Amino acid sequence: MELVVQSRETDKKSVIKKIRQQGGIPAVLYSGGKSLANIVVDARVFSKFLSTLESGALASTVFTLSYEGREIKALVKDIQYHVTTYDVIHLDFEELVDGRDVRLNVPIRCINTVDCVGVKLGGSLRQVIRCIRVVCKPKDIVPFLELDVQSLGLSQTLKLSDICIPEGIRPVTSLKEVAVTVARR
């Protein structure tokens, strides 16, 4: 996803309030854990993009930020919402630097749910864990990890270790945890 961002000067409440009134989202771009720049993202463009995303996919979406004539690859590290309107009011981006490890949550997508043996026998498929914490290089980031549930029967479970994790991605979460189960109704 490509976003054009503008620089902003200050962190004063009055300035940030004015940015939001003009249709912007105040944001901070971090690099190596340190603040690199205060920026503004167009609220309409970002909200439209959010509405097209699958649940949980924002954490592993790589953004290309056009900032002061250069292209910066970044991940959303934190997002804050308004309490009542649920509008995005602040973003934190983390710059992706080639060769430097990045920690992120990657969503788990169950595939072949319609053909699941346990569901055909009247069971209910329950996804216990929806994402897995991993460490990888920016070039190895994947939008999601797939877990095939086709052969899962009634009262059976699949663990995180059953996910086919691509080379270059190291899970931080314990792989012994149950990811999906088929329960009797």
Swiss-Prot record:
One GO term describing the cellular component: cytosolic large ribosomal subunit
GO molecular function: 5S rRNA binding; structural constituent of ribosome
Pfam assignment, any one: Ribosomal_L25p
Taxonomic superkingdom: Bacteria
Disulfide cysteine pairs (residue numbers): none
SUPFAM superfamilies: Ribosomal protein L25-like (SSF50715)
Keyword annotations from UniProtKB, A to Z: Ribonucleoprotein, Ribosomal protein, RNA-binding, rRNA-binding
InterPro entries associated with the record: Rbsml_bL25/Gln-tRNA_synth_N, Ribosomal_bL25/Gln-tRNA_synth, Ribosomal_bL25_b-dom, Ribosomal_bL25_C, Ribosomal_bL25_long, Ribosomal_L25_dom, Ribosomal_uL5_bac-type
CDD domains associated with the record: Ribosomal_L25_TL5_CTC
One of the protein's GO biological processes: translation
Signal peptide positions on this chain: none
Functional note: This is one of the proteins that binds to the 5S RNA in the ribosome where it forms part of the central protuberance.
Entry's family note: Belongs to the bacterial ribosomal protein bL25 family. CTC subfamily.
Assembly notes: Part of the 50S ribosomal subunit; part of the 5S rRNA/L5/L18/L25 subcomplex. Contacts the 5S rRNA. Binds to the 5S rRNA independently of L5 and L18.
Protein name: Large ribosomal subunit protein bL25
Species annotation: Chlamydia trachomatis serovar L2 (strain ATCC VR-902B / DSM 19102 / 434/Bu)
